[in-house]
């Protein structure tokens, strides 16, 4: 039996694959451009080992956009069911500060559970929004 040959993907930086079902869903299509970019950035930082640590300041720098737009993009993804807040941020000048951590609902959970796909339960009209 012949061995399957690998596809010629450039794997030097890793590969981020997003489900076609998600990309063609009305929930995804109703998102703003900043929220769509944030969704991809969150998946880029995803690991099966734990929740994604990604804050507003980091989103401001990587999208790039204003603080208000970054906060709005997080809220939009949360309301649409694409992300769920796991731990809120904490700032303390004497001890270590930590960023917000998120669970991406279309990807497996670090607790060895499958994706919950909460975004499928939310019905959004493209013309009217959430």
Model-derived segments and spans:
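Compositionally biased, intrinsically disordered low-complexity segments
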Residues: 18-21, 40, 66, 86, ...
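Proline-rich intrinsically disordered, low-complexity coils
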Residues: 8, 26, 48, 64, ...
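Short recognition helix of helix-turn-helix/winged-helix DNA-binding domains
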Residues: 1-58, 62, 80, 97
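Winged helix-turn-helix DNA-binding recognition segment
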Residues: 44-103, 107-108
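Acidic-enriched, low-complexity/disordered segments with a strong bias for Aspartate over Glutamate
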Residues: 10, 61, 87-88, 117-121
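Intrinsically disordered, low-complexity segments enriched in Ser/Pro/Gly/Ala and basic residues
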Residues: 4, 88, 124-126
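Acidic/proline-rich low-complexity IDRs
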Residues: 6, 21-22, 68, 106, ...
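Short, amphipathic alpha-helical interaction segments positioned at domain boundaries
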Residues: 100-130
